[in-house]
């Protein structure tokens, strides 16, 4: 447990210090002259801290970089699961949004009139005039971009998280616990890691009655569900790159359904997958994936990738070991 403790301490300390010291002032306007786009980049930089936590832990404990869970096991076996990681989140988000709009049909707006009007107002504020048809085409063009390009374009930052969570923490914890508690506990940890951002409105806003605890709890639930999906593709490929692609796909498509919402929806409900109905397809698939992982574990066929070395072993010990 030593390396797990060091990883979590470093990752949480660096992330929360950065978010309280830099992200909070930037988001509140205390740091003047920072445009909104720059604020997004400042916030996104926090995604690198889990990877830094892995680096510090591996170096400080002389673990080295054996079993880094980056190289896939084989193209033929891995490729289908990379495809699941790439396209699965968009498909599940669409299904969840469809369920939401079936439950709340009055919120469905196929013409995207709310977003069209908002975009036209923003353009008018800069002295430009955009026809509604042009804006509609611009908005629709974002969807194939989110499906086909966002997963790989986002991988630079999502790998920063996934090398830490699916590439280190989950496999480490799984050596001490069975797969079900491993994924429940690590999912909650991942959700709590987001807590400072959740407090200032990430995913769930700030104007709800149970702020901020309700948002933190909802984020933990979302992270448990998504964490199961990302762990599953990691197990099937042997590489946390699959999780990084899946994470990038989720981030790229998470807000797509809002284009078709009259009201903007409710983040706790839908149509975004962070809501209980918008995320219903994710929940169902995650339940099947968790059941399959549990079944494989009972049968002794769960091939969980190994991260690094056992707590009582260093790379120097391996070097001294007799060669067979």
Predicted ranges, named:
Residues 19-62, 78-90, 97, 103, ...:
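Alpha-helical transmembrane segments in multi-pass membrane proteins
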């Amino acid at each position: 447990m030593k390396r797990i403790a060091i990883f979590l301490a470093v990752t949480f300390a660096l992330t929360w210090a950065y978010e309280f010291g830099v992200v909070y002032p930037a988001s509140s306007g205390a740091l003047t002259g920072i445009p909104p786009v720059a604020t997004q980049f400042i916030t996104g930089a926090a995604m690198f801290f889990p990877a830094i936590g892995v680096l510090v832990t591996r170096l400080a404990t002389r673990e080295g970089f054996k079993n880094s869970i980056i190289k896939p096991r084989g193209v033929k076996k891995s490729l289908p699961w990379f495809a699941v990681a790439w396209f699965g989140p968009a498909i599940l988000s669409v299904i969840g949004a469809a369920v939401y709009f079936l439950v709340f049909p009055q919120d469905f707006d196929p013409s995207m009139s709310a977003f069209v009007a908002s975009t036209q107002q923003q353009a008018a504020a800069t002295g430009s005039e955009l026809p509604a048809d042009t804006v509609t085409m611009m908005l629709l063009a974002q969807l194939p971009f989110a499906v086909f390009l966002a997963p790989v374009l986002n991988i630079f930052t999502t790998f920063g998280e996934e090398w830490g969570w699916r590439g280190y923490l989950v496999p480490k914890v799984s050596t001490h616990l069975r797969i079900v508690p491993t994924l429940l506990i690590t999912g909650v940890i991942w959700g709590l890691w987001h807590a400072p951002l959740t407090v200032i409105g990430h995913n769930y806003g700030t104007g709800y009655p149970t702020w901020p605890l309700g948002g933190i709890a909802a984020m933990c639930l979302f992270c448990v569900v998504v964490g199961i999906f990302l762990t599953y593709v990691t197990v099937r490929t042997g590489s946390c790159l699959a999780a990084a692609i899946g994470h990038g796909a989720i981030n790229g498509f998470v807000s797509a359904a809002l284009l078709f919402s009259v009201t903007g929806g409710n983040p706790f409900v839908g149509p975004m997958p962070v809501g209980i109905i918008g995320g219903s397809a994710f929940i169902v698939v995650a339940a099947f994936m968790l059941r399959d992982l549990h079944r494989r574990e009972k049968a002794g066929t769960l091939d969980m990738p190994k991260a690094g070395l056992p707590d009582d072993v260093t790379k120097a010990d391996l070097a001294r070991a007799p060669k067979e």
